[in-house]
């Protein structure tokens, strides 16, 4: 028979393995019911419930023991799963703090936002823990569909456009994933990754056509989710159409989930040592690191620049997946951990400076001219911005430098000299567009008069929780060197 008989033993159920997801699913349902049976919506109550369930979930994850096969073999509670769940939950917790702003933007004033936010995180937790293609697809859909809704909650044209684009690209990615899973099911008779990997190791590629179809479709699906070139075109517009809080969310959380899935999926493909498979990954990495870097040089809006730089950072993470060693896996987690904290801080800064009026540009919310002379009008904000610029540019000893250092080191140790050279060259290119933001803040003259600056239009969205998150992220970025030992032990 093509398919082995299905034997279900409740000894392998392991209820604890799905407890983190159940916490958030139950939390989302509870929050939904609270809103349904209360006459008046309370943003503070909803945010408190969100934070409470995220903290409970994080504590549950910390208490889990590693187990290779759980929940009837569908889940794997390995280091990859537990570390990525931790990064997802920490990022989600920090980002929900940024919603505590003075300006009452529509998306944070709706009862639907908060339960959907919890459902999204639960979906990503299923994705990073799954050892089965079907459950990965379910987690992908559970996370993707609510994201489209949250994008459109602003009610603005650009928000609706972003939601439609994300939905369209997400539907295409899901279709690609389903087609790739079908190809490997026909090839191996299973959707379980362990069975697929074992089949490829022992039997080899018995049907090159099915193998090629599966690899190409799955690369396309993951490529859309983590915005690899040439699947990246939706991302800058989606960034532009969303507020900085949600833009930072979609640049961090879905991508870490996508790269964990890529690590589980693509490791088996890379280990086949088939030349064209390696060539595809090599080409994807090179163009994903390089092309967005060059496009970012010509952007006039800081948010769009950060969108393209995020795509380039995805190329560095994919390089770690491609190298496929224990050291490169550590490098990927360190890279994305540092990237997440720095991006939360940078986008928190944009959120701090966001206003309803497009005072500086008819189209863009955050053109470079908005930051001209910020050191004179708001010195603290400018200094925080400089820290995040140094971190994103990979200037030692700031945050992302350590991720890039480990990525390049793992490439050199694996004899990928060209890959290491491309990463170093593009790191140098990235300095130019990051420092353009720095120059605007520190060396350009303010466009507005001093009396206009004193009207505090730059920080009319500021609150103490937002300042607290941004300053905390700046401290992490600044003193990341002291975190490296503990972080490497955590991801080991």
Curated annotation (Swiss-Prot):
Gene (UniProt): nuoN
Enzyme class per UniProt: translocase
Transmembrane segments: 18-38, 45-65, 80-100, 108-128, 133-153, 167-187, 209-229, 250-270, 277-297, 305-325, 333-353, 381-401, 415-435, 464-484
Role: NDH-1 shuttles electrons from NADH, via FMN and iron-sulfur (Fe-S) centers, to quinones in the respiratory chain. The immediate electron acceptor for the enzyme in this species is believed to be ubiquinone. Couples the redox reaction to proton translocation (for every two electrons transferred, four hydrogen ions are translocated across the cytoplasmic membrane), and thus conserves the redox energy in a proton gradient.
Top-rank lineage group of the source organism: Bacteria
GO terms under biological process: ATP synthesis coupled electron transport
Pfam families hit by this protein: Proton_antipo_M
Subunit record text: NDH-1 is composed of 14 different subunits. Subunits NuoA, H, J, K, L, M, N constitute the membrane sector of the complex.
Main location: membrane
Source taxonomy: Bacteria, Pseudomonadati, Campylobacterota, Epsilonproteobacteria, Campylobacterales
Keyword Cell membrane: yes
Family assignment from sequence similarity: Belongs to the complex I subunit 2 family.
Enzyme Commission identifier(s): 7.1.1.-
Name of the featured protein: NADH-quinone oxidoreductase subunit N
């Amino acid at each position: 028979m093509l398919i082995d008989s299905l034997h279900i033993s409740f000894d392998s159920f392991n209820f604890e393995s799905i407890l983190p997801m159940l916490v958030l699913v139950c939390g989302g349902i509870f929050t939904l019911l609270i809103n349904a049976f209360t006459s008046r919506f309370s943003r503070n109550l909803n945010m408190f419930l969100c934070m409470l369930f995220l903290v409970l979930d994080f504590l549950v994850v910390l208490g889990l023991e590693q187990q290779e096969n759980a929940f009837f073999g569908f889940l794997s509670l390995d280091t990859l799963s537990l570390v990525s769940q931790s990064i997802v939950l920490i990022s989600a917790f920090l980002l929900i703090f940024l919603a505590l702003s003075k300006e009452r933007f529509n998306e944070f004033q709706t009862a639907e936002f908060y339960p959907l936010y919890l459902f999204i995180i639960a979906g990503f937790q299923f994705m990073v823990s799954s050892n089965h293609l079907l459950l990965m697809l379910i987690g992908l859909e559970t996370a993707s569909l609510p994201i489209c809704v949250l994008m459109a909650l602003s009610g603005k044209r650009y928000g609706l456009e972003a939601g439609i684009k994300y939905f369209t690209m997400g539907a295409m990615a899901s279709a690609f994933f389903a087609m790739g899973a079908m190809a490997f099911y026909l090839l191996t008779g299973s959707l379980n990754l362990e069975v697929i990997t074992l089949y490829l190791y022992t039997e080899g590629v018995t049907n090159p056509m099915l193998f090629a179809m599966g690899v190409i479709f799955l690369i396309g699906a993951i490529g859309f989710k983590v915005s690899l070139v040439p699947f990246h075109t939706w991302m800058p517009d989606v960034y532009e159409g969303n507020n900085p809080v949600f833009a930072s969310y979609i640049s961090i959380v879905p991508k870490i989930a996508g790269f964990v899935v890529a690590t589980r999926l693509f490791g088996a493909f890379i280990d086949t040592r088939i030349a064209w498979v390696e060539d595809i990954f090599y080409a994807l990495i090179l163009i994903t690191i390089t092309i967005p870097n060059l496009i970012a040089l010509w952007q006039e809006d800081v948010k769009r620049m950060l969108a393209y730089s995020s795509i380039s950072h995805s190329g560095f993470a994919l390089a770690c997946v491609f190298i496929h060693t224990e050291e490169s896996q550590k490098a990927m987690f360190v890279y994305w951990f540092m990237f997440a904290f720095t991006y939360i801080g940078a986008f928190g800064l944009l959120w701090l400076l966001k206003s309803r009026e497009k005072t500086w540009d008819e189209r863009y919310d955050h053109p470079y001219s908005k930051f001209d002379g910020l050191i004179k009008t708001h010195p603290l904000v400018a200094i925080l911005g400089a820290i995040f610029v140094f971190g994103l540019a990979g200037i030692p000893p700031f945050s992302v430098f350590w991720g890039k250092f480990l990525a390049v080191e793992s490439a050199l140790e694996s004899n990928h000299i060209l890959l290491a050279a491309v990463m170093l060259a593009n790191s140098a290119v990235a300095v130019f567009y990051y420092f353009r933001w720095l120059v605007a803040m520190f060396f350009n003259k303010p466009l507005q008069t001093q009396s206009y600056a004193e009207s505090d239009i730059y920080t009319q969205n500021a609150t103490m929780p937002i300042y607290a998150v941004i300053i905390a992220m700046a401290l992490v970025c600044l003193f990341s060197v002291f975190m490296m030992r503990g972080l490497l032990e955590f991801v080991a």
